Amino acid sequence: MRFLAAGAAAVGTAFLWRRQVEEDGPKRALKPDTALMCPLQSKQWVSADSMLLRFGLPSDEHVLGLPVPGHVMVIDDASIYRPYSPVTIDATTSGHFDLLVKHYPGGEISTQLARMRLGDLAHVRGPCGSDFTYRRGVARRMGLVAAGTGITPMWQIIQAVLNDPEDQTRISLVYASRSTDDILLRREIDAAAARHPDRFTARYVVSSAAEGETLPAGTSVGRIDAALLREHLPPPTASADERSRVLVCGPAPLLRALCGARARDGPTAPGQRRPPLGGLLRELGYPSEDVSWL
């Protein structure tokens, strides 16, 4: 019941955003009160347990209709929901959207998605957002910390910033994975960093490496700790003109370590107060108002 309530709040949050933008721009496929039926157009396994799924929209002129960052709820026949953040954004993609899905043994939704064949329909609801929505000028510098599939909403933000020629926000990404083979979207991330070396940097951390493995540039073995964050994230805000924002997305242990023991307890609707910031980010001097977890 708590999961369903959280989903309803997120849909309501994004509905407020949608009302502000629905009068302009392309056709938006998602409607808060209706499930969208999306045919599977392609499926590609990108790691041992993760797949990239492309779903069609009603026409080539339609965009999905999500804020950045945003997610959709994928629903099965038993009305079980699972949130997924697309790795495509409305600003650059129409006619389809892509989901990066990790297949968990015993996971009902991810197992059904893994079994889908081309042409099968997925039931999708949204738009869903969080209490942080990216807009140009929200910060001068952004630090993004992700683990596993927590990279997906971060990739939305990276695309939104780097594809806007008027946006001069600088982004630093710290991304943790189990191994180099599990670094999702690495090719796309590295290509973006190569195109925008003055605006975007990426640092990878893996839990382990094979004996004798040569790690790619920008990759280290270990864990996300205070020294790594201090080196690669922007410093805490020093002035209004140089505001820093830090976003964190990943499994509960990461959120607790970086943001405090109650990080998962925070409400998601705008205007509601989150639990006080704790963890490593507080130790490093970041104020609560400059940190969000997704």
Model-inferred region functions:
Residues 6-14, 174-294:
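Reductase modules of NAD(P)H-dependent flavoproteins
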Residues 25-120, 177-179, 207-209:
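Ferredoxin-reductase
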Residues 126-138:
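A short, basic/flexible loop-to-alpha-helix module at the beginning of a structural domain
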Residues 135-141, 240-242:
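Short helix-loop-beta connector
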Residues 139, 162-171:
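Conserved S-adenosyl-L-methionine
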Residues 141-143, 172, 245:
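Structural motif
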